[in-house]
Amino acid sequence: MRWDALFNDMESQLAEADRLSLEAEIGERTRAELVAIELSDRLRGVLGCTLGVHLLSGESVRGRLAHAGAEALVIDEDWYQVLIPYPAVARYVGLGRLARSEPSVVRRALGLAHSLRALARDRAELSISLGGSTGVTRLEGVIDRVGKDYVDVAAVTPGEARRSRHVGDVSTVPFAALAAIRSRKHAGL
């Protein structure tokens, strides 16, 4: 009987060691998988859901998440779409745990400049929030030109076409200063 008890005890200890080893491996694999998840993947997990976005500038945007790209996201508000570069965001409210990677290589390659070029091509009237240490500054106008890391915004009279006689001035804005770019929904993003 003593031998049976000894072998049963040893068997229980080995089973417990195997269980602990398996739990440790599962924990390690979970941590390794989490390291590979990008913020844009988490955002894609809540596409179509309501999301609150608090910007570093102090401004807040709340609406339906319409797109999560490589460098920016798009929020649908009632009348506007808001393009927000990821570096302008301080925090998100309503972001779930689900993550979805972008399967399209082409979509993964599309960055902020591509979205801004589409707005420039459409001559969309925009309200651009610039973030900084002094708070939010707004520019109203049309994008004239998009460079590698900057955008030229022509201030135009609201409702007027972008013609030289309607342009007040042209501001060159580094991408790093962009906090939010609002366009009317019908203009498309």
Outline where the language-model segments fall.
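Short glycine-rich, low-complexity segments
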Residues: 1-62, 66-189
